[in-house]
Every structure is written in structure tokens, then in C-alpha cells.
């Protein structure tokens, strides 16, 4: 399920499967603490939970999106492993610098380069998954492990140096 009347772009099945297969190949999900920032429907965080993550925090500033996240968590039987937070992404990262193992970063495609820089500087994670309409320059603090284009979507996996 996706939030109604919203310009949400749920990650396609093929992109999601390839992304999570890459995370699985690194052993990154088993027992992991995951942050699904710009959660939308929660599909990415729910996929992480279904593949062995111990906990996922879903952050979005749209209450309708968060209602959908809660419904999707309930429908999959994963509600006990999910924490749903209404907040603007950068404000959340500034207030709660809790370290996570994997951060799933799928902001709106209109997200600019400066916003990406701020986001990557603020997130406290070992690995990040970046989803965008273009290749993102991650800066010197990160090492890109994998980057692949799927039509209009570019997904990169990066590790903190």
C-alpha cells in the first residue's frame, strides 16, 4: 500500500530485490538496526525486517504516509519490530543521532546536491542505501561499494570510511 494523493514513488520490486540481495551478500541485515528515512509506504524498512533486521525506525513528515507504514507493518506481522516517527528527516537526524547499522535514504527526486551533503553528514550509519534520479557524490567520508541505474532510478550502496 502507498500513501494516497501523495507524490510518493514506491521503490519498484526489481530495484528493491536487487538492493536487498546486495545487502544480504554483505551480511548487513541479520540483527541490524535499520533507519528508513523518507519512509513513504515503509516498503524498504519492511523488506529489511523481513530479511532479518532486528528493528527498523520509519521516519516521514507526512502523517498519511505514516498511517500507511503502520498498516503495512501490521499486515506483515512486523509491527513489534518497527518504530514509526513523524519528523522532517534532517531535524530527526539532528535530534536523535542514534547509530544504526543500515540507513535507507530515499528522499524526493527534487532533493538537491547540498541537501544530500547535509543528509550524508548527519546520518550515523555504517552502511547507507541512496536512491535518487541521478548519481550522488558521497564525499570523502564514504566509499561507494555498488552503484547501479534501473531506468530513471540510481541506487548506490556506500560504507562509512
What are these regions (language model features)?
Residues 1-161:
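Class I S-adenosyl-L-methionine-dependent methyltransferase catalytic core
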Amino acid at each position: 500500500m502507498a500513501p494516497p494523493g501523495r507524490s510518493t514513488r514506491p521503490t519498484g520490486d526489481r530495484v528493491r530485490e536487487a538492493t536487498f540481495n546486495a545487502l544480504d551478500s554483505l551480511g548487513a541485515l541479520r540483527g541490524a538496526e535499520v533507519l528508513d528515512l523518507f519512509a513513504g509506504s515503509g516498503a524498504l524498512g519492511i523488506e529489511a525486517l523481513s530479511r532479518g533486521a532486528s528493528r527498523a525506525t520509519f521516519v516521514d513528515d507526512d502523517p498519511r504516509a505514516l498511517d500507511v507504514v503502520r498498516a503495512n507493518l501490521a499486515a506483515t506481522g512486523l509491527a513489534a519490530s518497527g518504530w514509526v516517527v513523524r519528523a522532517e528527516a534532517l531535524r530527526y537526524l539532528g535530534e536523535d543521532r542514534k547509530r544504526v547499522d543500515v540507513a535507507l535514504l530515499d528522499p524526493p527526486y527534487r532533493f538537491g546536491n547540498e541537501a544530500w551533503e547535509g543528509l550524508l553528514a548527519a546520518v550515523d550509519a555504517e552502511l547507507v542505501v541512496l536512491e535518487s534520479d541521478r548519481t550522488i557524490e558521497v564525499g570523502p567520508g564514504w566509499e561507494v561499494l555498488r552503484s547501479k541505474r534501473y531506468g530513471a532510478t540510481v541506487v548506490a550502496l556506500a560504507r562509512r570510511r
